[in-house]
């Protein structure tokens, strides 16, 4: 399965990163960076109405190359100017053609919070995320046990970062809540089959208490989708592909927002 391949590649990537910068050094640097240029991701998603997390995404396993002319800094600035609440940056290099450098450079030019979107399976990546400037990290229930998820949440929050905890079914929602997640994202894409079911957010919304921030991810393509989510008290949406492929990011984002 593609998810297993991504996780296996991530393990290799993390071990290589540790050879460049030790765990001890990464942790020390993260603690020194604890409040440096920090912007609250949670606060940005707590505003009334639907808040947009707009994604900077070059490629994906399901769609292949999404952006041939990948001017990631210009894209991020366009998102910010058009009213995005936050920016999600893919840093996974093997399957999504992402890069830590993209996040670092984007963070240096925007004022809104930046989410690191990657497959985080080692606490080293949490410390690394704070060092590179991430305001929030994605934690995926499908690749983490309850104990590890809880540990990662506590580590990230101890560094001042928010966590978007991603779930795909009832069991994962229960795990996320039990672990203490404050921001829960429901992925409408099944990470094992990569099939999309927009109704997944609607089905799982009722399981998440209203005092938590609820984010709908993947497969959101139309204003009608946004209106349905809004009617179901969804706090935020994560959109990437629809914007990246539009040809005019600002215009497409305005169409979905307004």
From Swiss-Prot:
Catalytic activity of the protein: 1-(2-carboxyphenylamino)-1-deoxy-D-ribulose 5-phosphate + H(+) = (1S,2R)-1-C-(indol-3-yl)glycerol 3-phosphate + CO2 + H2O
EC number: 4.1.1.48
Record has Transferase as a keyword: no
UniProt xrefs under Gene3D superfamilies: Aldolase class I
Pfam family, one: IGPS
Keywords attached to this entry: Amino-acid biosynthesis, Aromatic amino acid biosynthesis, Decarboxylase, Lyase, Tryptophan biosynthesis
Pathway per the UniProt entry: Amino-acid biosynthesis; L-tryptophan biosynthesis; L-tryptophan from chorismate: step 4/5
GO biological process, one term: L-tryptophan biosynthetic process
Superkingdom as given in the UniProt entry: Bacteria
Top EC group: lyase
GO molecular function: indole-3-glycerol-phosphate synthase activity; phosphoribosylanthranilate isomerase activity
PANTHER family xrefs: INDOLE-3-GLYCEROL-PHOSPHATE SYNTHASE, TRYPTOPHAN BIOSYNTHESIS PROTEIN
Sequence similarity: Belongs to the TrpC family.
Protein name from the UniProt record: Indole-3-glycerol phosphate synthase
